[in-house]
Every structure is written in structure tokens, then in C-alpha cells.
Amino acid sequence: MYRVAIEKLLKWKQSKRRKPLIIEGARQVGKTWLMKEFGRQSYTDTVYINFDSNSRMAELFASDLDTDRLIMGLELYVGHKIDPNNSLLVFDEVQEVPRALASLKYFYENAPQYHIVCAGSLLGIALHQGTSFPVGKVDFLKLYPLSFKEFLMATGKEQFAALLDSQDFQMITSFKQTYIDALKHYYFVGGMPEAVQSFTENKDFNEVREIQKRILAAYEQDFSKHAPNEIVPRLRMLWNSIPSQLAKENKKFIYGLVREGARAKDYETALLWLSDCGLVHKVSRVNTVGIPLRAYEDLKAFKLFVVDVGLLGCMAGLRQRTLLDGNDLFLEFKGALTEQYVCQQLKTIEDLDVYYYTNDRGSCEIDFVVDTGERIVPVEVKAEVNLRAKSLKTYHEKFAPEVSVRASMADYKKEEWLVNLPLYAIDQIVQI
């Protein structure tokens, strides 16, 4: 299975300023596989330590963090010398041993020749709870579920993925039905690696759904196991409200849908916990535009998306036939799935900040506004071929962006002020 993150890891390996690397991401997005596969491809030796199941290694890091001593202990454990140039040290579930996390500082300062990558299912929570390691001593990489392009490659459509990157939209349009069919499959399967692997091997949508149910059950178990007891009920209510939040025409998160009379302050900790786990994407509102967009963020108004479009469909109880064959009653939630899909793809683009826009009167709403660092791009999302873009026109007249994007099932078309970008090509948004 190809992951774009492998290329990022290769750049990390070759960097003269390389630091120990922490890979962040939700449970089961493929962090362990990625680290092992990177070691297999790029090193002659991989030293893999899982701190959740290895008490001996926990004891090694319990005393002083002298790097020579730690390397000696690791060598004794694996039974051979560790070559700084050819060995990859993999610390998995590193949040289980905070001292191992703290040791990264000393590896960076005293033994930078060693190549170290770390990950953990709930590492984001550990970092925000004050687990000790100095800022500036580590590199970070965020891992998400497979993007649509990675899904194409995983399902044997490597040439179609490469064609998207070529931006030969005349050729792309000739094969649009292939892309549309694959996109429908992606809406159902999503990008969780186990679900994608099952789909590529068996093409069994029922089996995919069972895998997604198991993943969601594991997330719920994490709530009980790792979250503070006092917020667990609120976590569950907030998490389970997301499909109904996104089913609304106005997808702004409303606490009253979580529980009648609910207030923001009652759920702030639960929301932060879900965000730190990587289970949700919080997309905040802006009501004006400038670089950086973050300076205009309205923290009180936001949309909440889940980590994966396939999991959202599973949470909502969508059936295979409804999604793949179409149903008039499904049209409203199809908009929710499409916005979820677009948000998910935008999040996989490095250094892209994602917001949404409404004016103060609420008469103009743009589904997403992205900050590339060089320009602000408004994105209006249409689930079908609908080419109306009233809000986008209003936004364009007010802010005169360099480019405005309508993402829909229609073919690529560049007009005077507007680009219609097919949904299956949304990852090309920075280059157009």
C-alpha cells in the first residue's frame, strides 16, 4: 500500500537538520505500518519497540536518560549493534512511557546521529497534558487516512492518480466515469487502511462496514479507558451527534443538538480531547479575509467533521445501495458526505489552513476558505453537477480573490473568475 508520507519520511532522513520525529494521527490510520515500512524500504535494520507491551524497555528508560546507556540497553535487547547510519529506531505507543518521550531531547542534543521515529494512538493527548519534552527538539508529521489519490493507487488505478497530478483535464474528463465510480467507492470505504485493504482484496462492502464498526467501537473504548471519567458521557454524546450536525443545511455545530440546554463551556474539554486524539477536524468560521486567516478565526463558531468519510457513513448507518445507487431521500446527507470528503482531502495537503466563511448577516456562506500561505482560496462544495454559485459570486465581488473554486461533479472548467474543479481532483487546489 502506497502512502505519500513515505516520501516525507525520506526527506526527513536526508535532512541535515533532522531531529527525532513524532508521527501524530488517530488510532488505526496506519502509523505503525508506516514506520515499519519506512524502515524496511530505507534501512538495513529496524529496531522496533512497543512501549505498551514491553515492560523491560519501560524499565530501561525509568532511570537516567544518558543516550550511551540507552543505546547499550537497546543493543542488549535486540542482540546486535545499532548502526547510526543504517538502523532506524522505532518507538511505538511512546505515550505509555513519558520518560521515553522525554529522552528525545537528549538524543537530539547528544546523539543526533541516530534516526528515531515515534508514534502513539493517543500521543496528542499526552503532549497537551504536559508530558515533558522541549519544543524545538523534535520534528512532527501528521498522518491521516488514505486520501482519494492514495485510494486510487491502492485499488490498482495508479495511472489515474498520476493523470490527476498532470492536470491534463481534457484527458481526465475522458475518463470521468472511472473517477466518479471510484469516488463513490471511496465515500463508502473511506481511507482507514484496514478497510481499504479489505476492499482491495475482497470487494466486499459488508466486510468493510464490519471493519469500520470495529474501529468505531475501539474509539468508544478509548473514551472509557483514557479520558477523564467526568467527561466520558459528554464525549460520547458529542461524538455521536456529529452525523446529525452535518445533516443540517447549515452545518455549524450546535451544542443544543448534543443535549437540550447544553452550553459550550460544558463540552469544551470533551471537544479538545477528541481534537487531540485526531478524531475530529474543527473548521472555524471567519467573517473577513486576510493573510493569515488564523488572525480572523471565530473560535465560537465552527463545523465539526470526523477523521474519515467512511466512518461518518458508518456512524450514520448508510447502506451500500443507498450510497452507490442513489436515492432521493439520501440527497441531504450526500451533501454532508461531500463536505466531509472535501475537508478530509484538504487536511491532507501540508501547511493548508482550512476555515469556512459567513458574513455577519449570515446571508453569504462559503463552505471552505483555505489559506495556502500565498493566497486565500474560497471553495464552494456541490454534491452533484449543480453549477449555481450565488454565495461564491457575492464573496468574489467583495474580496476579489485571485481564484474562486466550485467543487462539484461537473467537468473542469475555467471561467473569468471561477474554476469548476471536479470533486475527484480537489487535491489539485493549490496548483490550479
Regions from the PLM with identified roles:
Residues 128-247:
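Interdomain motor-coupling "hinge/lid" segment immediately C-terminal to the ATP-binding subdomain
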Residues 90, 115-121, 142:
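Structural recognition of the conserved hydrophobic beta-strand(s) that form the central parallel beta-sheet
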Residues 53-84:
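Short glycine-rich substrate-engagement loop in P-loop NTPases that contacts/grips substrate
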Residues 1-14:
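N-terminal pre-Walker A segment at the start of P-loop NTPase domains
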Residues 200-365, 369-370:
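Accessory nucleic acid-recognition modules appended to NTPase machines
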Residues 34, 38:
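Hydrophobic positions on the alpha1 helix immediately C-terminal to the Walker A/P-loop
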Residues 31:
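Conserved lysine of the Walker
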Residues 346, 366-385, 404:
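Conserved catalytic cores of phosphodiester-cleaving nucleases, focusing on short active-site segments
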